[in-house]
């Protein structure tokens, strides 16, 4: 979203700059694509292996169309009560241009049709946003045994897609995700009000250009081409995922009851050894004697918090630069 977008800007604007390896933007983009495609493939392979192994412990990820009649009835009710009310279909036609889809949101493009009086099909295109307010992984109630069965939210939405388009049939569909340019373009030298410039740049970033398209499942070429044209991308910008998009949903699944024997033991971070015998001593005093390297998460982030707190009341501290930090429990 940042570095690749910056390289794309160089290519589009005809800027020729070389990095330390004497590679220009085009060469870097090609190398990045080859590396990321390989990583994506490895990720899918490892994930699919893990999901297959989970079946040995009674956890099955399946498709709605493979469920038994009773489970389908439950899923239909779940869809009508929880999913249908929060999904708003978006038409795409001459009067409704391709909608702006927010960065990293998952959507399904659907090709629907209506039978005309002469027997021919009238085709239309629509977008079904996959709502982020709902869990991506849905558990199907147990059938009285030890099996735990799950389906994916996007699979449920596409399975019941005809419910959103009464009077139309579903020809085909494709689930996809767009990555957008999230780089901040700020001219600190020219900006008269840096805060306002940052705020305006953040607003522009929400509508950044598309830089990558991820697709999964049975990809229909005509739908893929339609999306590529609509967001001004090319085939080289497409990443085909062997599985489902956005693996972050499995982080929550890791906390599912019944997986205790498969989890790693909780890890407690430690206080750096250099600070163990210096309780109460100023960190500035300690680092004045020797450098202190804190490796999080193996060592406690509390040290960094103490450093910031002490710097805040130190009259000799001029400024503090913070890049980013992960959420803490």
Task: Annotate the PLM regions.
Residues 1-319:
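N-terminal non-catalytic structural scaffold regions of very large proteins
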Residues 322, 327-329:
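Single conserved hydrophobic/aromatic residue that forms the stacking wall/gate
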